[in-house]
Amino acid sequence: MAYDSNYTFPDPETSDKQGLLAIGGVLTPKRVLQAYSQGIFPWYEPGNPVLWWSPNPRLILIPNEFKISRSLKKTLKKPFKLTVDTAFQRVISYCATCSDRANKTWITSEMIETYTQLHEMGYAHSFEIWDGSELVGGLYGISLGHAFFGESMFHTITDASKVALHFLCSIMQSWNFDFIDCQLPTLHLMRLGAKIISRKEFLHMLQETLKYPDKKGNWSVN
């Protein structure tokens, strides 16, 4: 993995009660990869310094534990086209427009540039849901070892982001991935099968999954 050897993050256990661990620094692909490998992720508002987080507790989703409601089961029967890594920039741009962490836009232009570079490096991936030729839902995130770190989802029609998450879980399960990091607990994701674990347990799971080689490259699935 391409780490930033010129920067060392503090121990995640030293973060404050909200999970804030460090402030500042330049958002580069190598630094972001190093952060994820230590259970840390960037989250900040436009115009502010980069904030680095390692919350306790943490929310994860085991790929085979995704819960399908009756309404979603009906939606999954619709003739959507499902693709991977065919429209990364469009997905992250939609997510930036629709992002909703405390109803604030947090996907900055700097983040879009950095994660697009990570996509070109083979670490960041997008899952796309199409209704005909229209992109109606999707998500993106980072892959390291046998873990996928979900960043954001969007939908323009009902349940399309859930379809994207179900698609992600199906692919991750077929590749024997261990978990999807959902970062912060939300009722929405918990209803879909995500569960809360301690940061200590998360960091242990992370170190175990990082023993596997990274699945880099374009994941295009038609």
From Swiss-Prot:
Pfam families: Leu_Phe_trans. It catalyses: N-terminal L-lysyl-[protein] + L-leucyl-tRNA(Leu) = N-terminal L-leucyl-L-lysyl-[protein] + tRNA(Leu) + H(+); N-terminal L-arginyl-[protein] + L-leucyl-tRNA(Leu) = N-terminal L-leucyl-L-arginyl-[protein] + tRNA(Leu) + H(+); L-phenylalanyl-tRNA(Phe) + an N-terminal L-alpha-aminoacyl-[protein] = an N-terminal L-phenylalanyl-L-alpha-aminoacyl-[protein] + tRNA(Phe). It comes from the Bacteria. Disulfide bonds: none annotated. InterPro entries: Acyl_CoA_acyltransferase, Leu/Phe-tRNA_Trfase, Leu/Phe-tRNA_Trfase_C, Leu/Phe-tRNA_Trfase_N. GO terms for cellular component: cytoplasm. Its EC number is 2.3.2.6. One of its GO terms (biological process) is protein catabolic process. Functions in the N-end rule pathway of protein degradation where it conjugates Leu, Phe and, less efficiently, Met from aminoacyl-tRNAs to the N-termini of proteins containing an N-terminal arginine or lysine. Belongs to the L/F-transferase family. PANTHER family: LEUCYL/PHENYLALANYL-TRNA--PROTEIN TRANSFERASE, LEUCYL_PHENYLALANYL-TRNA--PROTEIN TRANSFERASE. This is Leucyl/phenylalanyl-tRNA--protein transferase. It comes from Legionella pneumophila (strain Lens).
